[in-house]
Structure formats: structure tokens, C-alpha cells
């Protein structure tokens, strides 16, 4: 797998998954023969990795905040940096009950994790029916009681929420995709207006969907934070925190 920096690690993960063993087991039993059928499957999966298909899509899952989430090419692969949204949710909301909506949920990793970590009533939304199917399967496998709704941002959503969390597409269409991200859904990566279009639309929608003193928690490229902060300020949101890729806003007192 020339040209892939993590080739050895990726091969071990794929082989361990195929054999249904741990990587530790592989290291301890390196001389054991491999069943011909298992070897054939492993080699086919390694060929996919040579084509730069992400490991998470090959093995069908990805770890996020200590839990295993199913993924496929209809959803973005959860990133470690997105865990900061959960950490900041805990820090700025605490253990209070409330209503949270995860907009553009994809695999459901943010909303499901929030539901399992805190006493929140959670709704997952996505414009993609296929993504919602994956989120529903993850909610079921992790025993998370959540509601699901297909919606373009909050356009088809009624009611108001204490917390809106969103990892929306924020990559500029001018960005050159890596071989791996070339396999991820463009719908989950790219947005117009240098990556800001969907985030700005969601900020506009907080006026009718976010309660006073409620939180808006977003992920965005740090280079976009100033523009997002200025836009949010003009719409009644005060910046509460910046943490890596995570932005936290609080809604000031006004009519909802």
C-alpha cells in the first residue's frame, strides 16, 4: 500500500477485523496459518485500501467518544476533533435536562452520544434519508432513545430547543479533496460561500428554534471562526467558547 503513511496499521486493523480478532492477537499469533476464505476476504479489503477507500468504510464502523458507530459511504466518518463538541456541551450545559437537536446528524454520533451522556431529549435530523437510516441503526445498537426527522437544516422542524448542535459541511468547494475524502459524500463536506453557506443559514434559523439562554454548538474550520462569530453576534448570539474546531454560542434574551 505504497503512498499510505499508515499502511501497516491499516493492514493490521483490516486483517484483525476480517479474522474477528484483536491486533494484539495478531502480534502474538503471527505464525498461525489463515483460513483460505478469510485470507481472500482480507486481500479484497486490502485492495480497497490500496484504492484509498477509508478504513472505516472497509470495516464498517468507527469509534467516537468510546463507542462504536456504524458508517458507510452515505455518511461522513466521525473525526476525533468532533469530540470537542460533546466536551463543550457537558461543560456549558452540565447535567440539566433539556431538548437538543443534532442538525445534519450523519451517523448520529453527536446526538446519540449527547443522549447517552446527558439527561437530554434528543432529535436527529438530516437532509439525507440514507444518512438517517445509518443514524437509526446506530441509535438502536447503542440503545439510545432518540427521535429522527428528515429535514433540510431546520426547515421542516417545529418547536424550540435548548441546544442546537451541528457539524455541517464547512469545506469550500475550491478545496482539493484527498484520496480518502474523495470516497466520502460531497453533500456532507462542501458548502457554498467558502464553506459558510449552511452554517449561516442555520444561525438565521436559531431565531425561531433556539430558546433564550440556549446553546448553539458548531464545528467549523478555525479560519472561519471570526466570520461566523461576527454573523452570529448580529443575530443575538454571544460567543461563549472556542475550542479547536468547536464554537459555542449562547442566545441572549429576546423573543423566540
Model-inferred region functions:
Residues 80-178, 201:
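Conserved SAM/SAH cofactor-binding pocket of Class I
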Residues 253-256:
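Flexible, glycine-/basic-rich loop-and-beta segments that form/coincide
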Residues 194-251:
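Conserved Class I SAM-dependent methyltransferase catalytic core
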Residues 16-88:
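Conserved AdoMet
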Residues 7-11, 41, 198:
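Residue-level detector of well-ordered alpha-helical segments, enriched
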Residues 168-198:
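Mobile active-site "lid"/loop adjacent to the S-adenosyl-L-methionine
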Residues 21, 77, 129-130, 197, ...:
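Short alpha-helical
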Residues 1-7:
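Non-catalytic nucleic-acid substrate-recognition regions in nucleic-acid-modifying enzymes
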Amino acid at each position: 500500500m505504497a503512498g499510505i503513511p499508515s499502511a501497516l496499521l491499516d493492514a493490521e486493523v483490516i486483517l484483525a477485523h476480517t479474522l474477528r480478532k484483536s491486533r494484539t492477537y495478531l502480534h502474538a499469533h503471527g505464525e498461525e496459518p489463515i483460513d483460505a476464505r478469510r485470507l481472500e476476504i482480507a486481500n479484497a479489503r486490502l485492495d480497497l485500501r490500496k484504492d484509498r477507500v477509508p478504513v472505516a468504510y472497509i470495516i464498517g464502523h468507527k469509534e467516537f467518544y468510546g463507542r462504536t458507530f456504524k458508517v458507510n459511504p452515505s455518511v461522513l466518518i466521525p473525526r476525533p476533533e468532533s469530540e470537542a463538541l460533546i466536551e463543550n456541551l457537558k461543560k456549558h450545559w452540565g447535567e440539566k435536562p433539556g431538548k437538543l437537536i443534532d442538525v445534519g446528524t450523519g451517523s448520529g454520533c453527536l446526538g446519540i452520544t449527547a443522549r447517552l451522556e446527558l439527561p437530554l431529549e434528543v432529535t436527529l435530523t438530516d437532509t439525507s434519508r440514507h444518512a438517517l437510516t445509518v443514524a437509526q441503526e446506530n441509535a438502536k445498537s447503542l440503545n439510545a432513545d432518540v427521535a429522527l426527522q428528515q429535514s433540510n437544516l431546520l426547515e421542516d422542524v417545529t418547536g424550540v430547543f435548548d441546544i442546537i448542535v451541528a457539524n455541517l459541511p464547512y469545506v469550500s468547494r475550491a478545496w482539493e479533496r484527498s484520496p480518502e475524502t474523495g470516497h466520502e459524500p460531497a453533500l456532507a463536506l462542501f458548502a457554498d460561500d467558502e464553506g459558510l453557506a449552511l452554517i449561516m443559514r442555520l444561525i438565521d434559523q436559531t431565531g425561531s428554534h433556539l430558546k433564550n439562554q440556549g446553546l448553539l454548538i458548531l464545528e467549523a474550520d478555525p479560519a472561519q471562526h471570526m466570520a461566523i462569530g461576527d454573523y452570529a453576534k448580529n443575530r443575538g448570539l454571544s460567543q461563549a467558547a472556542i475550542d479547536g474546531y468547536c464554537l459555542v454560542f449562547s442566545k441572549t434574551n429576546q423573543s423566540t
